[in-house]
Amino acid sequence: MRFALLMLVLSGCASHQGIRIPGPTANVGSERVAYAPPEKNEVEHVEPASRSTRQGRRVAKAAESFLGKKRIVVDGQKQRYDCSGMVCAAYKKADIPLSGSSKMLFEQAQDMNVFHKRKRPDVGDIAFFDNTWDRNKNGRRDDKLTHVAIVETVEKDGTITLIHLGGSGITRLVMNMRHPSRKVNADGKKWNDVLRKGKDGGPVLTGELCRGFGSLWSIQNRQLASL
């Protein structure tokens, strides 16, 4: 009798269906892991658009008026005929007092906290360059602030048109700080001009030699605000 009852219990267990646990069971009973939210994608830095202020446009327009000129005259006075002299003359013609060498202009921009390295500068900004020529004639690339130019226009793709006084007189230059080491793009559009003879194999393009920009046209805004 007892044997019969035992067989009945065993047969009942064999026919009984087990409880199903949905999902994977590998971690059932293991230590719980705290929920970690998915990492947020890093927000891409969007550089401010190039500004075209009234003062900046006046500086660029003044520089444009010097193109091709063999001498620079502002208000009846002959101006210094070199790169920084042309820059200062453009500012003077735009009624913004400015004077000094490339180094002095750079120091003024730093002192006024208007020096920047944005890839899209503002119209009227001064572009500063290093190592455009071997000023100390030691054969090394250690010549700082050897050239300056005026930003005339800035395109959406970052292509910058500059006006400068170089070996060929007062002419335009092209530069693209988004692609500083490329002379042209895939379509043949010029991105950077050659600004130095590359006998030593070093950088020669405008974008490679550019140190940054100074928005010294803002001097006029500060002068008006102080009145």
Regions found by a protein language model. Give the residues of each.
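Hydrophobic h-region of N-terminal signal peptides that target proteins for export
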Residues: 7-15
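Aromatic- and glycine-rich peptidoglycan recognition patches
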Residues: 14-34, 140-227
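N-terminal capping segments
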Residues: 14-99, 110, 204-227
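...with weaker cross-activation on analogous glycine-rich loops/strands in unrelated enzymes
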Residues: 97-175
